[in-house]
Amino acid sequence: MNSLTFVSPKLFGLLPISIPSFRPFVKRDKSVYNRKEFGHWEADTVVSGKGKSKACFATLAERKTRFYIAIKIPDRKGSTLAKAVIAALSQLPKGAVKTITCDRGSEFANWREIEKALGCQMYFADPYCAWQKGTNENLNGLLREFYPKGRNLSRVSPKTLEKNLALMNARPKKVLNFQKPQDLFELFLKKCCT
């Protein structure tokens, strides 16, 4: 385990927050890399345009099925994001959340709270290595088709977000042999958790 420093995104008055004992990306099990096992997630945030609002989406992608979840949250505080992630993933059966890989943003400062509540392990990508959680980054890009950069996300209704996520999860993907993430996710939920 290493020590991790989170840096506030503000340009002036940076306040590093030292987080001890984080798990680096390279410590993940091989089953996470090769996508053979269900229940490994990637997490990130999609933010509003500069100066528009503090509202953002907490996003989660299951690596094997490419199933995607986005939750609108009022700000990027660690406590806010932790509550949203716990609320979304705690609805799933035990065994559906084994690991979560995220970046080193300050919004993940409450990672131990997430681990404890979900019974999973969290791993942190290396700085400036977005490819280490590429599934989530790719899906965030697809979400931007509905909510382009610069958009005030505080104005997005939960119903509209839910509808757009349903469209994304119902889109057949070549990487999944033209199966839909929603269908695969439901299939693996039944297999792993019954």
Description of each model-found segment:
Residues E115-T194:
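Charged alpha-helix within mobile-element recombinases
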Residues F57, F67, K94, Q121-A125:
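Polytopic alpha-helical membrane proteins, predominantly small-molecule transporters/carriers
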Residues G49, S53, A70-K94:
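Active-site beta-loop-alpha junctions of metal-dependent nucleic acid enzymes
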